[in-house]
């Protein structure tokens, strides 16, 4: 491990965030800290993760949701102090790493089937 990777590993450990394991296709609820005047509140942004980039401290993920018939996408830095929480609502079964094709789809064609993890259930019992 070189010096830059060592420094990034220390910064990630110092951030102390508990980030759940998620993949593109999963439905996420991201709690974003919003500052309004002197008050700070948490606003939830719920949508489908369409992309994830793992680059140490520069890791980010893109979440897409439909809001009043319009598609809204936000790119969140994974270790941002403005992210309060990340919750996996539903796991999706997809065969691509980037789901940019969902941008051109609406309605039933934009649905993603739910992923069933049989291996984890078999390991418990």
From Swiss-Prot:
Organism: Sphingopyxis alaskensis (strain DSM 13593 / LMG 18877 / RB2256)
Protein name: Large ribosomal subunit protein bL19
Family matches, as PANTHER family: LARGE RIBOSOMAL SUBUNIT PROTEIN BL19M, RIBOSOMAL PROTEIN L19
GO biological process terms on file: translation
PROSITE patterns in UniProt: RIBOSOMAL_L19 (PS01015)
InterPro entries the record matches: Ribosomal_bL19, Ribosomal_bL19_CS, Ribosomal_bL19_sf, Translation_prot_SH3-like_sf
One GO CC term on file: cytosolic large ribosomal subunit
Pfam families membership: Ribosomal_L19
Domain of life from the UniProt record: Bacteria
Alphabetic keyword roster: Ribonucleoprotein, Ribosomal protein
Its job: This protein is located at the 30S-50S ribosomal subunit interface and may play a role in the structure and function of the aminoacyl-tRNA binding site.
GO molecular function: structural constituent of ribosome
Protein family per UniProt: Belongs to the bacterial ribosomal protein bL19 family.
